[in-house]
């Protein structure tokens, strides 16, 4: 009976499920693990980075992307779907919202827009759900925040969470280690340790990517934009953190 609904994009099965969304979640769970942790003075996003070949240039594989100078996001799942959502998010933040209000959107507003785009693909003919889950970190007048958005368009705010293949083990680790007084530096160490719990092999600056959203504006910002709160850590900075754990 389930097979009858497996390829329908918009039809509920008798037990109330959209099977294509479950398949999209399977794509997320097949992806590498990504971790997000909210600290008292910022948010850290960390993810595994596995080149498909030893000949690939690792530095060209970016999994953490800036949406505005103060908001960044990472994914687990299908990379091409993520790129589409990054483009749509940037269009909303930097074109639509900024033209009207002359400022970038607060983190929650942007998350709601992303979630709406993802939800629409679950009820429209001729499309399929996005095969990604997102962790969105941002800084606005309310302080640092961390959200998770799933293929169904569901979103929640989190103190700390993980998505991807080893998310269950990573969440269990975070539940043991997290506390409300955690500062950003400690959060980076905790994120690395959470990935290390389930990583096959040795973590190096070449196979992990880390970005932070800090309460303090960065000197260089992103892509030359000064004063932003989002910053992707360099390989040398990641190496220093790895040496400390």
UniProtKB/Swiss-Prot annotation:
Q: Read off the SMART domains from this record.
A: Proteasome_A_N
Q: Which GO terms describe its cellular component?
A: cytosol; nucleus; proteasome core complex, alpha-subunit complex
Similarity section: Belongs to the peptidase T1A family.
Q: Does the keyword Cytoplasm apply?
A: yes
User: What is the superkingdom listed in this entry's lineage?
Assistant: Eukaryota
A Pfam family matched by this chain, by name?
A: Proteasome_A_N
Q: Does the keyword Metal-binding apply?
A: no
Explain the purpose of this protein: The proteasome is a multicatalytic proteinase complex which is characterized by its ability to cleave peptides with Arg, Phe, Tyr, Leu, and Glu adjacent to the leaving group at neutral or slightly basic pH. The proteasome has an ATP-dependent proteolytic activity.
User: What does the record list as GO biological process?
Assistant: proteasome-mediated ubiquitin-dependent protein catabolic process
- Which UniProt keywords are listed? Cytoplasm, Nucleus, Proteasome
This chain belongs to which protein, by name?
Probable proteasome subunit alpha type-2
What compartments host this protein?
Cytoplasm; Nucleus
* Oligomer and partners: The 26S proteasome consists of a 20S proteasome core and two 19S regulatory subunits. The 20S proteasome core is composed of 28 subunits that are arranged in four stacked rings, resulting in a barrel-shaped structure. The two end rings are each formed by seven alpha subunits, and the two central rings are each formed by seven beta subunits. The catalytic chamber with the active sites is on the inside of the barrel.
Q: Which organism is it from?
A: Schizosaccharomyces pombe (strain 972 / ATCC 24843)
């Amino acid at each position: 009976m389930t097979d009858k609904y497996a390829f329908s994009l918009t039809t509920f099965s008798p037990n109330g499920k959209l099977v294509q969304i479950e398949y999209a979640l399977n794509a997320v769970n097949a992806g590498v693990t990504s971790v997000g942790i909210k600290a008292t003075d910022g948010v850290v996003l960390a993810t595994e980075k596995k080149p498909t070949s030893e000949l690939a240039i690792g530095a060209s594989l970016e999994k953490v992307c800036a949406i505005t100078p103060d908001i960044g996001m990472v994914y687990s799942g299908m990379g091409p779907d993520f790129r589409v959502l990054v483009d749509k998010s940037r269009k909303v933040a930097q074109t639509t919202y900024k033209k009207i209000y002359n400022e970038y959107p607060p983190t929650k507003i942007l998350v709601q827009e992303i979630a709406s785009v993802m939800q629409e693909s679950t009820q429209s003919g001729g499309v399929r759900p996005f095969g990604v889950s997102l962790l969105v970190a941002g800084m606005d007048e309310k302080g640092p925040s961390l959200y998770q958005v799933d293929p169904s368009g569901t979103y929640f705010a989190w103190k700390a969470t993980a998505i991807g293949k080893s998310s269950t083990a990573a969440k269990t680790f975070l539940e043991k280690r997290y506390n409300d007084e955690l500062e950003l530096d400690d959060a980076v160490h905790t994120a690395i340790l959470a990935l290390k719990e389930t990583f096959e092999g040795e973590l190096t600056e070449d196979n992990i990517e880390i970005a932070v959203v800090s309460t303090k504006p960065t000197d260089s910002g992103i892509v030359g934009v000064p004063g932003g709160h989002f910053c992707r850590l360099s390989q040398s900075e990641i190496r220093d953190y790895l040496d400390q754990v």
